[in-house]
Amino acid sequence: MNKYIGLFFCLAIVISCEHSSQLSSFDYKDLKKAPVLSLEDVFEPIKFIPLKTTESHNISNILKVCMTEDSFYILTVNPFGIFRFALDGSLISTISVEGRAEGEYLIPTDIAFSKADNVLYVTDIAKGIMKFSSDGTYLSTVSSTTKYKNRQFVISDSGSIIENVLNVSGNERDGIVELSQEGDTLNYVPNNLFFDCVTPIALPNHHSLRKYAGEVLYNPSYCDTIYSYKSGQLIPKYAFNFPHHITKEDLRDFYSNISDKQFIMEFAEDSKNLYLSIFDRSWNYSHYVLKKTDGIICRGDFRLSDSFDTEFSPRWQNESWLIDVLDPSTINYGYTRDITDDARQRAYSYLSSVGIEGITMESDPIIMLAKAK
């Protein structure tokens, strides 16, 4: 599975990416000259947690991982499935099944766990926003006033549902919609960027919304700005001046232009750092760390080992824990790179050296947890 561009829905994200005079931008050309920090410089030792499933379950294509105090909830695609694992990696249960009956999902696009009410939320293209208890019991479906089908979302500390609307043709009214538990619209951020799609697209592995310490951060796909969101307001927080940024014309036929562009692919923030994974032309990815103590940005060499090229990337987050997944079959090499048996064996030897024995191409994915030093 390609780590970043695994599954494309026929949709496009269109949110205004205008710069604000309130924000100091970082010039990406300067970042390329920044000093380099290793994985060990930035994080405590990585925790590796091999998942343990049975032959009847396929979890090789992971779209989302939610971590709670006692579990991992994992959303997979091809086939669709939602699984609950203990923190030691053992399978506890499945969450519902794919189907048309009440309480079953058809095409889930995101999951989120609310610690406040101990509820797992599942957004589904066909069903809306479904709610399950922590043990997987179906509770209800939120009757949304919006008509948008494909969503990414977070649950605020107050219990509201903050959706990132993934647009279809570049002419939708809203960018973010904030809903009550009853499905009423509390706030929304209008979409100010309109275009005609030649080839509608979306990057489902780009998670536009993050939440840390009660703050909701928002980075529209293909946008160079990260915002803080609150009650219908977007406040620019970080911006990056990319020499090869994405334009409105690029969005009309994104597949034809992506290989020559630069944009934020993944981001996360904790009390110490801002973490960035930048799509940097020709299908390359570069990692950066903004240290809050001194405001210095460094490049990140986040390879697990010098012996092979698999990197840690902050794909998901639970408070101060940053989460990634290692797929033993691909060792997270993208489809533009050759995966040799030698590289796989070096990866498996490294895992053995950190206490993860017996990994093969057929092994289940391995959760990787990192926390800043």
Residue ranges of predicted features:
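Blade/loop signatures of beta-propeller domains
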Residues: 20-52
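Beta-strand-rich domains and repeat architectures in extracellular enzymes and scaffolds
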Residues: 47-80
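Blade-loop segments of beta-propeller domains
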Residues: 52-56, 61, 90-117, 124
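Short coil/turn segments at the loop-to-beta-strand junctions that recur within blades
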Residues: 53-55, 96-104, 143-150, 192-197, ...
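Repeated scaffold domains used in trafficking and secretory/extracellular systems
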Residues: 61-64, 106-111, 147-156, 198-207, ...
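Short beta-strand elements that form the blades of beta-propeller/WD-repeat-like
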Residues: 71-76, 118-124, 158-170, 210-227, ...
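Asp-box/WD-like beta-propeller blade repeats and closely related beta-sheet repeat scaffolds
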Residues: 123-173, 188-196
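Conserved blade-ending motifs and adjacent loop-strand segments that build the rim/top face
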Residues: 237-259, 293-318, 332
